Amino acid sequence: MYKSVSETRHPLQSEEQEVGIDPLFSYSNKTRGDLSQNGRGSNSTLDTEGTFNSYMKEWEELFVNNNYLATVRQKGINGQLRSSRFRSICWKLFLCVLPQDKSQWISKIKELRAWYSSIKEIHITNPRKAAGQQDLMINNPLSQDEGSLWNKFFQDKELRSMIEQDVKRTFPEMQFFQQENVRKILTDVLFCYARENEQLLYKQGMHELLAPIIFTLHCDHQAFLHASESAQPSEEMKTLLNPEYLEHDAYAMFSQLMETAEPWFSTFEHDGQKGKETLMAPIPFARPQDLGPTVAIVTKVNQIQDHLLKKHDIELYMHLNRLEIAPQIYGLRWVRLLFGREFPLQDLLVVWDALFADSLNLSLVDYVFTAMLLYIRDALISSNYQTCLGLLMHYPIIGDIHSLILKALFLRDPKRNPRPATYQFHPNLDYYKARGADLMNKSRTNARGAPLNIHKVSNSLINFGRKLISPASAPGSMGGPVPGNNSSSSFSAAIPTRTSTEAPRHHLLQQQQQQQHQQQQQQQPQQQQQQHQQQQQQQRLMKSESMPVQLNKGQSSKTISSSPSIESLPGGREFTGSPPPSATKKDSFFSNIARSRSHSKTMGRKESEEELEAQISFLQGQLNDLDAMCKYCAKVMDMHLVNIQDVVLQENLEKEDQILVSLAGLKQIKDILKGSLRFNQSQLEAGENEQITIADDHYCSSGQDQGSQVPRAAKQASSEMPGCTGGTTPDDFILVSKEDEGHRARGAFSGQAQPLLTLRSTSGKSRAPACSPLLFSDPLMGPASASASSSNPSSSPDDDSSKESGFTIVSPLDI
C-alpha cells in the first residue's frame, strides 16, 4: 500500500517546505495532507476551473449564436483557429460531416461511427474464426476461389503491407506518428477506405492527407480531457470529443475530403479530343502535356499555370516555359497533398483552415498554388533551371503563412479582398541550386555519356571500315577498272582498259590513281563517321541539357572537317598530292581533341550567357514593376488633383493663385510619373532643388545644338511682344500640360486633368496667354514652329504629335 504524504516526508525536511503529491492518489485522498498541501490543492483547483471557464467561453464564441457557421468560416479564413481547441469540430462543419443544425449533431455523429464499425467488421476479418461455418473445399489457405476468406485474407495482407510501408514514412520528424497505435489507426482507416472504393483503392499520398486529420483530433481530445478534470462538460461535448472514437471520426472526415480529392488521385485517362478529324489534323507546335489523353490532376495544374499564372505574372510564366519546367514536375505533389510537404505542420493546419472554410470543393487551392509561385517569383526569374527546380521541389519556409492566404484571396477576388502587404523573399540560392542539381543528376545518370568513350567508339568504327575497304583496293597492277563505291564508280569507269604493251607507259599513272582511290575510299567513311559522331554528341547534349537556352545555342555549331574535301574534285583529272593515311590519322586525332576543347569553351560561354540572361530578366522585371507603379501613382494623382482643383475653383480663397500654381507643379510631377514629360537627370545633380522646373527645350528630343537655340528664340520673342513686362523671371509662370485637344470641347474638368485657363504668376496677378514668354519649338518642324507656337501657348507635350507616350531612355550624351 501507498503511504500517506506525511509519512513519506524526509526527516530533515522542514514543515514549511512543499511536498510532492503522489499522482496515483485520487482527488479525495489529496485533501488529507497538511495545511500547506490544502492551500496548494486549492490553487490548482482555481487554475483548473479557470481553464475550464476559458474552454467553455471559446465554445460559446464559436457555436452558441444564430449565425455561428459564418463566424467559424471567417475565423478559419483569417487564421484565427491556430490555437483553437475545437478545430476538429470546425473541420467537421466545413467538410459537412456535421450538419448545420446543432440539434442533429449527436445523432449524426453516432450514425457515422456505427457506419465505420460495420465497415471495419466486414473488411477486417480473421478467416480462422469463420472456418467452422464455411465449406472447407473453398475456405482453405490454398484455395484461389474468389469467395474464399483465405484468398481475401492474402489479398488484404498485400494491400496492408503497401499501406504500412507508406505509414512508416509519415512525418518522420514527429514522435506522435511513430507510435504503434497511431500507425495502426492510419493503416486501418486507409485500408477500409481502399476496400470501400475498389475503383480507386489506395494511392500513395493518401496517408499524408489523413495524418493531419488524426493529429487535429488527438489535440482536441487532449484539450477536452484536460478541461474536464475540474468540471463536468456537457453531454454534447462528451459525445463529439470522445477519444475512443478518434478512428471513426477520422474515417468520416477523410471520406468527405476524398470526395473532392478523388479525381486528383485517379489514374483513369480521359481524352478530351475525340473524333476522326482530330487524328487527321493534330495541333501544330503543341506541348507534350497538351497532346493525347490526360488525367484530371495534370489538366488542373496545366490550367493553373497556363491561365492563372499567365494572367497575374506573364513574365514568370514565360520564364518557366523557356526553362521547360512543366507544372507536373512540382504541381502534382502540391495539389494532391494539399501542400502537405511544402509547409511545417502547424502552418499547414492554418492553410487547411482556409481551404476547408472557403468551400467544400477546395477552389482556393488554385490561387494558393499561384500565390506560392508569386512569393518566390524574383528568385525564380533570376535563377537557372537547377535553382528553379530546387526552389519548387523544396519550397522555402514562409515567415507569415497568413499573408499567403491573403494573397490567394486577393488574386481570386481583388474587389472584395484588400491588396496584402508586399512581402520580399531573399533566399540562399546556392542551397536550392545544389538541391536542384541533385535532382537533375539522378535523372541524368543514364542519359549522360563520357566524351572519351564517344571518341573511342568512333575510332573503332573507322578502323573497322578501313579493314572492310582495304581488300577492294589490293589489285593495283591490273588494267581493269578498280571496284569502289558509288561516288568513285564514274571515275573508275573513265579509265580505259590498257594492253600489255602500254602497261609500262601508264604504270606510274595507274599506281597514282589507285592510291588516290584508296585514300578517297578511306576518307569518305571517315567523314561520314565524324558527322555521325557529331550528330550523336549533339543528341546526347540535347537529352542531358534540360535548358532550352542551351539547346538553341548548341545547334548553331558548324561541322568541323578533319580532312580535305574530295567530293568537289572532278574525276579523270590529275589531283594534287593527298595526305598519306598516317597524316589522316593524326588529323582525326587532333580534330577530336579540338572538338572537345571547343565543346568545353562552348559550355563555358553558355553558362556566362545564361547568367547574363538571368540578370536581364531580373532587371526587366524590376523595370516593369516601376513602370506599373509610376502609372498607378499618376492615375491616382490625376484623380485627386482634379477633385482638388474643382473645389478650389468653386471656393473664393485668398491664396487661390498659389494653390493653383502648386497644383500645376503637382501635375508636372504626375506627367513625369506617367511618362508624358521627360525627366532630366541633371536636375538631381545640379543641387537639391525644391521645385522641379522644365526648360524651354525640355520636349525636344534632338541634340544639344538644337536644344540651345530654343531659349534664345524664346527670349527674343518675349522681348518683341507688346504688353509684357521685362521684369519677369522663369519662376513667375508655370507651364501646365493638357491631356488632349478634345477635352476643351467636352468642358472643363471632365474627369481628367485640364489645363489652367490662364497662366498665373506668383504675385497673384493673372496674365493673358499672349504675354507668355514660353515658346515651343519643334525641331522636326523647323523655325516656323516657333512662331506658330506663339498663337497656341497652351500646347503641351501631352499632344500625340510632339511626343510618344510611355517612358523613354535618355542617354547621357542627349542631356
From Swiss-Prot:
Biological process per Gene Ontology, one example term: protein transport
Polar residues bias locations: 754-765
Name assigned to this protein: TBC1 domain family member 5
- Domain of life, source organism: Eukaryota
Segments of this protein annotated with the region Required for interaction with ATG8 family proteins: 806-811
Q: Which UniProt keywords apply?
A: Autophagy, Cytoplasmic vesicle, Endosome, GTPase activation, Membrane, Methylation, Phosphoprotein, Protein transport, Transport
**A cellular component term, taken from the record's GO annotations:** autophagosome
Record-listed Phosphoserine modification sites: 44, 460, 546, 563, 565, 568, 578, 608, 811
Q: What is known of its domains?
A: The arginine and glutamine fingers are critical for the GTPase-activating mechanism, they pull out Rab's 'switch 2' glutamine and insert in Rab's active site. The LIR (LC3-interacting region) motif mediates the interaction with ATG8 family proteins. LIR 1 is also implicated in interaction with retromer; LIR 2 is only implicated in interaction with ATG8 family proteins.
Q: Where is this motif: LIR 1?
A: 57-62
> Site annotation (Glutamine finger): which residues?
204
List residues traversing the bilayer: none
> What gene, per UniProt, encodes this protein?
Tbc1d5
Question: Which GO MF terms are attached to this record?
Answer: GTPase activator activity
Tell where it localizes.
Endosome membrane; Cytoplasmic vesicle, Autophagosome
Q: What is the lineage of its organism?
A: Eukaryota, Metazoa, Chordata, Craniata, Vertebrata
In residue numbers, the region (Required for interaction with retromer) covers: 56-64
Q: Specify the signal sequence span.
A: none
Q: Which residues carry this modification: Omega-N-methylarginine?
A: 448
Specify the species. Answer: Mus musculus (Mouse)
